[in-house]
C-alpha cells in the first residue's frame, strides 16, 4: 500500500499509531481540533516580515546576526515559494515505491544549490531545554 505522508500525518502516527492506520486505510478519520488562529496570525506576520527583506535581497536581522546563517540567502523565486507555502498545494517528494512526502513550507534559505526549510514555531510559552530535539 502506498502512502501520502505530511507533517500532520506523521504526528498522528507518533501520537496514535492506531488512529494513523485507520486513517491511511480509509476506515476512520480522527476529528480535527480547534484551528489555532493566534499561531496562524503570527505565521502571516512572519511571512510578511521575511518578504520585506527578500525584496531587498537581505536576510532579516534575526538571521543575519546568527553565525550559522553566514553565506545564506532567502529563496528568491516568489511564485514558486507562494505555491510551496500553500497548504493545499505545497511541495512533494516521491520515493521509488511511490510513497509521497508532502507539506507546505514557511520559508526557504538557500546555500549554494542546497535548500534549508524554515519552519516557524509560534507558541505562547518559553522554549524548553529539549525543544530543538523534537524537530
Locate each region found by the language model.
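Mg2+/Mn2+-dependent nuclease catalytic core
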Residues: 85-86, 90-135
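Structured catalytic/translocation cores of nucleotide/phosphate-coupled proteins
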Residues: 1-12, 18-24, 99-103, 107-111, ...
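Nuclease catalytic cores
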Residues: 2-65
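A generic structural signal for solvent-exposed, polar alpha-helical segments
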Residues: 26-27, 56, 81, 90, ...
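Detector for Asparagine
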Residues: 11, 26, 51, 65-66, ...
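Short N-terminal secondary-structure initiator segments
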Residues: 54-73, 114-116, 124-129
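A short acidic/basic microdomain associated with nuclease active sites
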Residues: 59-97
Amino acid at each position: 500500500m502506498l502512502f501520502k505522508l505530511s507533517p500532520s500525518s506523521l504526528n498522528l502516527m507518533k501520537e496514535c499509531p492506531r488512529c494513523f492506520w485507520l486513517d491511511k486505510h480509509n476506515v476512520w478519520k480522527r476529528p480535527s481540533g480547534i484551528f489555532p488562529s493566534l499561531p496562524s496570525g503570527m505565521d502571516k506576520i512572519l511571512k510578511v516580515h521575511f518578504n520585506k527583506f527578500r525584496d531587498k535581497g537581505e536576510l532579516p536581522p534575526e538571521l543575519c546576526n546568527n553565525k550559522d546563517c553566514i553565506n545564506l540567502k532567502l529563496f528568491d523565486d516568489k511564485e514558486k515559494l507562494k505555491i510551496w507555502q500553500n497548504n493545499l498545494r505545497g511541495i512533494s517528494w516521491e520515493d521509488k515505491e511511490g510513497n509521497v512526502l508532502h507539506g507546505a513550507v514557511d520559508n526557504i534559505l538557500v546555500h549554494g544549490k542546497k535548500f534549508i526549510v524554515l519552519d516557524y514555531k509560534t507558541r505562547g510559552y518559553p522554549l524548553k531545554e529539549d525543544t530543538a530535539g523534537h524537530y
